[in-house]
Curated annotation (Swiss-Prot):
This is Glyceraldehyde-3-phosphate dehydrogenase 2. Keywords: Cytoplasm, Glycolysis, NAD, Oxidoreductase. It catalyses: D-glyceraldehyde 3-phosphate + phosphate + NAD(+) = (2R)-3-phospho-glyceroyl phosphate + NADH + H(+). SMART domains: Gp_dh_N (SM00846). Its EC number is 1.2.1.12. The keyword Cytoplasm applies. It comes from Drosophila subobscura (Fruit fly). It is found in: Cytoplasm. Homotetramer. One of its GO terms (cellular component) is cytosol. It comes from the Eukaryota. PANTHER family: GLYCERALDEHYDE 3-PHOSPHATE DEHYDROGENASE (PTHR10836), GLYCERALDEHYDE-3-PHOSPHATE DEHYDROGENASE-RELATED (PTHR10836:SF76).
Amino acid sequence: RIGRLVLRAAIDKGASVVAVNDPFIDVNYMVYLFKFDSTHGRFKGTVVAEGGFLVVNGQKITVFSERDPANINWASAGAEYVVESTGVFTTIEKASTHLKGGAKKVVISAPSADAPMFVCGVNLDAYKPDMKVVSNASCTTNCLAPLAKVINDNFEIVEGLMTTVHATTATQKTVDGPSGKLWRDGRGAAQNIIPAATGAAKAVGKVIPALNGKLTGMAFRVPTPNVSVVDLTVRLGKGASYDEIKAKVQEAANGPLKGILGYTDEEVVSTDFLSDTHSSVFDAKAGISLNDKFVKLISWYDNE
């Protein structure tokens, strides 16, 4: 699913996509799944299967069907940059197998235990050209980190707790079923609010070293199809009114983080952010302040 949405986004941005890999479905099924999307709507361009190719807006895309990334001949299709979005090959060792087929760089669309992790607007300046495998972190980290950066840069985060109220994802169960060691994760997604673990807050410490060990968090999985929201509650080192905090966030949203961190003071709800391309949209009306050093901040994100 993430791969299909990456393809939509790439087409919107004018990127040249030359190949895709999916070992589980044929090209005709790919056409169907790409054309129709229950959450984001029908694809506005054209998509057909032709001679074994996936043809999107007239552009032929080579289709591979390999379970082992090492067997994908990316070079034959002219692919240089690969988005690894299976959620399976998330370490440097596993993701590097794409390089055997001729890829030059691999971007993992998930957190990684050992690959360098980057969040747009936060730590891209640390990227080095010799890095061949990198992680773009999680959707929640991409929402949390830009906001945490603005707050820490201006007011110093002493410590904080994060909760993400998170839409249903593909790994959840439609009805109650077994789920390994995480028993609650196996409960029916449409019937329950499910407390769950997330490493998103701790991951912020990897992209903002000054916050390492200062943030942790959890998730509540809720029965909505898309769009999630971060609740960041922090103790500040430098006292500030809520209005002062809002002003700094808005300044960043209109300046260095434009297009990454958004700002709204309207009466919004989750569906208002469906297909929103910002990593994070600060909700000025939803946050609250107990005093000038203890504040709860709210930010929305389309988690897909």
